[in-house]
Amino acid sequence: RRLHKGTRALDNLQTLKWLTEAGVELKWNLLWGIPGEDPDEYRVMAELLPAIVHFAPPIAVGQVRADRFSPYFCQPAQYGIENLRPHRAFRFVYPLPDESLQRLAYYFEHDFADGRDPQHYIEPWLDAVEQWQNDHHRATLSASFQEDGALVLSDTRPCAAGFQHRLSGLERELYVYCDRGRRFGDLRHFA
């Protein structure tokens, strides 16, 4: 939501799930260094990533940029951004003075007004993403309905408690209910 694109993490996970089920080959990126983020969110995400290792991992991980004409470029102070400067790659391509590079560049680097440096808090998360990229091809999580109505989960993720889990009764009902992404509060009526 901090990128103001109208989606939540749960929506993104549901999309990964649906596209995986449909057999779509996914190519996507993961962004970090989003203005207004809570550094502790990276710790939480690093802990959760092993649970989704069966989904296609991002092909690239990169820092959010302030591109020309973007809100981060046009209204940097509103997002706690300062010191906008042309991306360092422009210096290698165009041997021009700073003023000319500033007018020419489309991609910009920046600092955060509060002094934060995301490089100092994303390392465990980056390690978890790399582990995801390494483990993905060996990990599956699938469900099959049995003739007796039970649901059998087959799980080869490294975090799996066991290879197969048989769900029936309330466990099966909860699993099926959660097939469409749900929030914890949505589960109250099962209590």
Model-derived segments and their meaning:
Residues 31-33, 156, 190:
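Short strand-loop junctions, especially beta-strand C-caps/beta-turns
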Residues 1-55:
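Conserved non-cysteine loop/helix-boundary elements of the Radical SAM core domain that shape
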Residues 165-191:
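Long, charge-rich, low-complexity alpha-helical segments
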Residues 22, 39-173:
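C-terminal scaffold of the Radical SAM
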